[in-house]
C-alpha cells in the first residue's frame, strides 16, 4: 500500500487580518486574487463572477445601490471556520444640502498576487483536498464508507467602510469661508462656531475691522489623522490686542491652516477669594482671631492686576460685598480693539460676615453685636477665667482700699490655714507619742508578769521539795521509834520511796526467810535478768529506752511485790533499773555532797566523799558499780557500743541530783559523768 504524499506546507498569509468580534478569534486568510478590469468596471465582486470559493474583492468605491449576497456553498464547512454572517451596508452619507457627499478620487492600492500553490477553480470544478489517512482498519470485514471530507473555508471578507472625511476648502486661505461653505469628504459637516462678546451675548455679526475675530482660518483634516490637534493657550504680548488670550493650532507651523480666536472666553478662572475662618465659640478673644480684610489699596491693586492680565474674564462680585449697595458698579472690560478710557470704580470695603456654624446662614448683625457686648460685659464683671488666687480678682476691685482689704483677708486666711496645719500636726505627733508610750508600757508589763510567774513557780517548787524532805525525815524518825511488836508497814512501794524504807520493808519480809540481803532485792533481780537476756551484747543497752507500756506494767507489778519479770526485752529491764534509781526520794549520793562530788578531781577526793555517805547507800554502790564496770568491758562494748564513758553518762543522773535548779545543769552534767566514771574505774 503506497503512502500518500504529505500535504503541501502553506506559507504564512500576506493579507490583512480582521479584528476579533464578539470574542471570536478569526483565522488569517490568503489574499484574494486581483480583480479584472471588467469586474472593476461593473463594480461586482469575484464571488458573483467566478467560483463560490473565491473571496470577495474589496472595492474602493462603494455603490450603495449595488448590494448582493453570495450564494451558499454546498460543501460542508468546518466547525472551526467562521460563520457566514450577513453584513449590512453602511448608510450613504449626505452633505448639508441633502445631496450626495463630495468624494475625492483616491488611488486604489494594488493587492499582491496570490501564492503559486493556489489553483484557480471554475464553477464546475471541485476543490482538491488531501486524502484521508485511515490509521486503523475496521473491526468487521465490511468496508465502512469514509466520512465526508472537512473543507476549511476562509471567512468572508469585511465590508469596505468609507474612508475618513477629508476637509477640502472651497476657497483660498486668504478669505475664510463660513461654516456652511465647508465640505467634508465623509459627508459630516463641521459644527457652527458661536462667537461671544465680552458681555456674554452671541456675536453673529461679521466685523470687517477685525478679521481675526470674525474669520475662521481654513481647516485641514488630513487623511492620516482626521482630528485636529488640541489647541494650546498662550498670552499674546501685542499691545493692540490688550493681552487677550488666543488659541493656536499647533499644526500651523507646518503650513496647514490654523484656528485662532483673539476674543474667546478664557478657559482658566481665577481662584476664589479666601473664606475667613469661623470660630465655634463666643469667646471674644477667639472671635478677634478672624482673618480681617486687607486695606482698600491692596484690594484695588490685586483686582487691577487681575484685570490687566485677563481682560476677557468677567469676575463675579466678591462674596462679602453687599450687591444691594448703590455704590457698587460691576466693572466690565471693553472690547479688544478699543482702548480702556475709563478707570475701574472704587472697591467697596469688604467686611467679614458672621455665619451660623450649622446651616452657614448669615447672622443678624445687630443681634450679633448685642450678644458680643453682653458677653464682654459679663466676662469683665465676674465671669473671668480662674487666676492664681481663686474667688477674687484685682481687676474687679476698683479702689485701693478694696485691694488692701482683699490682701489682708488673704493673709488672714493664709495664717489661719497655717495655724490649722500646725495644730493638726502637733495633735498627730502627740497621738503617735502616746501610742508608742502605751505600747512600751504594755510590753514592760508583760515582761514583769512573766518574770513574776517564773519566780512563783520556782518558789512553789522549792517549797514542795522542802516539804517532801521534812516529811521523809519525820517518817524515818518515826519508823525508827516504833516498837518491834508493831508490824504495821507505812509504805510498801519499791519505786518512788526512800532507800531506808525499802530496806526496812525488805527486812520485815525477809524475817520469815533464813537469808537476808544488805541491798535492795530489786537490784539483784534486774541485774541478773539483764545478764540472762544477753544485755551486754545488745547494742545500745541502757541508752535505748524500752517500750513505755511494758515498763509501766512491770513497775506496777513490782510495787505489789510480784517479782516475776515476764519479759524478753533487755531494754525494758535496763529502763526499770534506771527508773528505780531516779525515783528514789533521796539519791544514792546525798544532795548535801553534790557540790563536793562535781568538784572532785582525783580518786582521793572521790573516796573521801564515799566515806561520808550512809552505810545503806555504800552497800548499793558496792553492788551497782562492779556491775557497771563489767558491762562496760571492751569485749562487751564492741557489741553494745557502750564503753565506760557512755555508761557513766547514762547513770550519772540517777546517782547524783541537785535540789536547786540552776542554769548550769548542762555544764554540771559533764562533772557528774566524770565523778561516776571515777567510781567505775576505782571499782575492784
UniProtKB/Swiss-Prot annotation:
Keyword tags: Coiled coil, Cytoplasm, GTPase activation
What's the chief localization of this chain? cytoplasm
Task: Please note every region of biased composition (Basic and acidic residues).
Answer: 404-470
Q: Where is the composition biased (Low complexity)?
A: 54-84, 94-110, 118-131, 168-188, 197-226, 233-264, 293-311, 472-486
Name of the protein in its database record: Rho GTPase-activating protein gacO
What organism, scientifically named, is this protein from?
Dictyostelium discoideum
Q: Name one GO biological process term.
A: signal transduction
Q: Spell out the coiled coil positions from the record.
A: 399-473
The record's section on SUPFAM superfamilies has: GTPase activation domain, GAP
A GO CC term attached to the entry: cytoplasm
List all Polar residues biased stretches.
Answer: 11-23
Rho-GAP domain residues: 497-684
SMART domains the record matches: RhoGAP (SM00324)
Q: What molecular function terms (GO) are annotated for this protein?
A: GTPase activator activity
Q: Where in the cell is it found?
A: Cytoplasm
Give the lineage. Eukaryota, Amoebozoa, Evosea, Eumycetozoa, Dictyostelia
Region annotation Disordered: where it falls in the sequence: 1-283, 292-311, 403-489
Location of site Arginine finger? 543
Residue ranges under compositional bias (Pro residues)? 1-10, 144-167
**In terms of domain of life, where is this protein from?**
Eukaryota
This molecule's function is given as: Rho GTPase-activating protein involved in the signal transduction pathway.
Q: Which Pfam families match?
A: RhoGAP
Amino acid at each position: 500500500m503506497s503512502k500518500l504524499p504529505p500535504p503541501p506546507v502553506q506559507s504564512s498569509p500576506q493579507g490583512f487580518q480582521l479584528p476579533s468580534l464578539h470574542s471570536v478569534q478569526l483565522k488569517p486568510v490568503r489574499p484574494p486574487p486581483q480583480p479584472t478590469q471588467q469586474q472593476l468596471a461593473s463594480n461586482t465582486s469575484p464571488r458573483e463572477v467566478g467560483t463560490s470559493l473565491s473571496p470577495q474583492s474589496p472595492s474602493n468605491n462603494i455603490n450603495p445601490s449595488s448590494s448582493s449576497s453570495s450564494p451558499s456553498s454546498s460543501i460542508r464547512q468546518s466547525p472551526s471556520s467562521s460563520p457566514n454572517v450577513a453584513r449590512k451596508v453602511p448608510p450613504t452619507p449626505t452633505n448639508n444640502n441633502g445631496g450626495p457627499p463630495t468624494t475625492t478620487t483616491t488611488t486604489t492600492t494594488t493587492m499582491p498576487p496570490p501564492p503559486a500553490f493556489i489553483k484557480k477553480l471554475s464553477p464546475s470544478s471541485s476543490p482538491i483536498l488531501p486524502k484521508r489517512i485511515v490509521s486503523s482498519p475496521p473491526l468487521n470485514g465490511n468496508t465502512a464508507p469514509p466520512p465526508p471530507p472537512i473543507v476549511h473555508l476562509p471567512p468572508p471578507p469585511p465590508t469596505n467602510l468609507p474612508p475618513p472625511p477629508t476637509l477640502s476648502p472651497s476657497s483660498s486661505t486668504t478669505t475664510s469661508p463660513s461654516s456652511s461653505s465647508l465640505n467634508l469628504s465623509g459627508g459630516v459637516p463641521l459644527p457652527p462656531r458661536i462667537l461671544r462678546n465680552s458681555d456674554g451675548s452671541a456675536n453673529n455679526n461679521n466685523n470687517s475691522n477685525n478679521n481675526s475675530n470674525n474669520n475662521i482660518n481654513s481647516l485641514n483634516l488630513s487623511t492620516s489623522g482626521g482630528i485636529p490637534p488640541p489647541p494650546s493657550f498662550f498670552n499674546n504680548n501685542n499691545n493692540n490686542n490688550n493681552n487677550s488670550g488666543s488659541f493656536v493650532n499647533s499644526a500651523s507651523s507646518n503650513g496647514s491652516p490654523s484656528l485662532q480666536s483673539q476674543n474667546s472666553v478664557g478657559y482658566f478662572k481665577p481662584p476664589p477669594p479666601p473664606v475667613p475662618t469661623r470660630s465655634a465659640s463666643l469667646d471674644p478673644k477667639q472671635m478677634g482671631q478672624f482673618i480681617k480684610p486687607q486695606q482698600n489699596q491692596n484690594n484695588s491693586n490685586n483686582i487691577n492686576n487681575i484685570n490687566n492680565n485677563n481682560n476677557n474674564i468677567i469676575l463675579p462680585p466678591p462674596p462679602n460685598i453687599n450687591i444691594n449697595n448703590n455704590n457698587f458698579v460691576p466693572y466690565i472690560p471693553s472690547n479688544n480693539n478699543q482702548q480702556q478710557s475709563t478707570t475701574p470704580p472704587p472697591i467697596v470695603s469688604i467686611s467679614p460676615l458672621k455665619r451660623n456654624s450649622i446651616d452657614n446662614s448669615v447672622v443678624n448683625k445687630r443681634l450679633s453685636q448685642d450678644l458680643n457686648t453682653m458677653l464682654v460685659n459679663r466676662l469683665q464683671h465676674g465671669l473671668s477665667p480662674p487666676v492664681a488666687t481663686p474667688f477674687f480678682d484685682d481687676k474687679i476691685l476698683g479702689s485701693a482700699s478694696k485691694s488692701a482689704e482683699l490682701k489682708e483677708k488673704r493673709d488672714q486666711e493664709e495664717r489661719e490655714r497655717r495655724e490649722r496645719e500646725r495644730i493638726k500636726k502637733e495633735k498627730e505627733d502627740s497621738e503617735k507619742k502616746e501610742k508608742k508610750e502605751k505600747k512600751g508600757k504594755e510590753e514592760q508589763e508583760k515582761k514583769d508578769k512573766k518574770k513574776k510567774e517564773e519566780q512563783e513557780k520556782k518558789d512553789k517548787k522549792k517549797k514542795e521539795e522542802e516539804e517532801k524532805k521534812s516529811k521523809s525525815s519525820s517518817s524515818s524518825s518515826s519508823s525508827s521509834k516504833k516498837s518491834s511488836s508493831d508490824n504495821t508497814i507505812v509504805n510498801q512501794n519499791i519505786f518512788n520511796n526512800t532507800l531506808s524504807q525499802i530496806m526496812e520493808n525488805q527486812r520485815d519480809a525477809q524475817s520469815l526467810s533464813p537469808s537476808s540481803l544488805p541491798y535492795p532485792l530489786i537490784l539483784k533481780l534486774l541485774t541478773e535478768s539483764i545478764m540472762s537476756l544477753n544485755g551486754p551484747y545488745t547494742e545500745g543497752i541502757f541508752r535505748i529506752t524500752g517500750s513505755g507500756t511494758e515498763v509501766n506494767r512491770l513497775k506496777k507489778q513490782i510495787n505489789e511485790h510480784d517479782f516475776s519479770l515476764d519479759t524478753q526485752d533487755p531494754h525494758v529491764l535496763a529502763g526499770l533499773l534506771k527508773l528505780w534509781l531516779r525515783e528514789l526520794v533521796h539519791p544514792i549520793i546525798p544532795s548535801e555532797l553534790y557540790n563536793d562530788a562535781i568538784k572532785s578531781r582525783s580518786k582521793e577526793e572521790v573516796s573521801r566523799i564515799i566515806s561520808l555517805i550512809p552505810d545503806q547507800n555504800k552497800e548499793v554502790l558496792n553492788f551497782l558499780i562492779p556491775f557497771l564496770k563489767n558491762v562496760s568491758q571492751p569485749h562487751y562494748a564492741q557489741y553494745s557500743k557502750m564503753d565506760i564513758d557512755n555508761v557513766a553518762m547514762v547513770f550519772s543522773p540517777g546517782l547524783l541530783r541537785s535540789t536547786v535548779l540552776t542554769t548550769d545543769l548542762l555544764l554540771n552534767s559533764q562533772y557528774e559523768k566524770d565523778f561516776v566514771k571515777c567510781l567505775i574505774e576505782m571499782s575492784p
